[in-house]
Amino acid sequence: TTLFRSLEQILITSTSETYGTAQYVPIDEKRPLVGQSPYSASKIAADQLAISYYKSFELPIKLVRPFNTYGPRQSARAIIPTIISQLLNGKTEIELGSLSPTRDLTFVNDTCIGLEDIYKSNSLFGQVTNIGMNSEISIGNLAQLIAKTMNIQLTIKSREERIRPENSEVERLLCDNLKLLKHTDWNPKYSLEQGITEVIEWMKKPENLNYFKSDRYNV
């Protein structure tokens, strides 16, 4: 208890996947939580435990829900490096899962600034705050945007083994970031096009591209 009371604050990083498929858009912090996958269910449990410590012991927590963050050094299983690595390895026909789900994508630098701004805020203790761009793009259109940025004519093959189970797939994510904008000075610097260009330039370096095995499905 003494240690807890000496802490200035704790930021708990959650995920937009705790909201499940959008019941309304944009998705605000009041949206009921839905565990559509073991990952999101585990994050919901962690979120609720953190809130319980705030309510029971006044632990100074702030709970942050970033929507999809991307950038250099991202896991090979994420959609943007999956697309870019296949294209950089000479493929013009790439393999993806479902093309219809939409995602709200924030460049990693902007997400980090959002975390810092939430930390600096004098409010938001014991509350949830979204971080996202309030903009969505489908997986299919994202792949085409990346190909256009790389000046590549692209064909997409949707492979069944890459498609998430129907009841697990989050079909639509679009962030309501009004709470973040109200309580902080957050001002994202990167458009989707700028962020994608940063990732492409980083992945072009052979020592970086070697981390990504485009010939296999990373799960």
Predicted regions and their residues:
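N-terminal Rossmann-like NAD(P)+-binding domain of SDR-like oxidoreductases, especially those catalyzing
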Residues: T1-T69, Y190, T197-M203, N208, ...
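Glycine/proline-rich active-site loop of Rossmann-fold NAD(P)-dependent oxidoreductases
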Residues: I44, T69-T82, G90-T92, V108-N109, ...
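Conserved active-site helix of classical SDR/Rossmann-fold NAD(P)-dependent CH-OH oxidoreductases
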Residues: I44-I51, K55, P81-I84, I113, ...
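A short C-terminal helix-loop "cap" of Rossmann-like NAD(P)-dependent dehydrogenase/epimerase domains
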Residues: F57-P60, I84-E95, S121, T149-E161, ...
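Hydrophobic "lid"/C-terminal helical patch
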Residues: I83, L87, C112-Y119, A143-I146, ...
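C-terminal "lid/loop" region of Rossmann-like NAD(P)-dependent oxidoreductases
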Residues: S98, Q127-T129, S138-A143, N151-R172, ...
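Conserved C-terminal active-site "lid" loop/helix of NAD(P)H-dependent oxidoreductases
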Residues: V108, I163-N187, Q194, E198
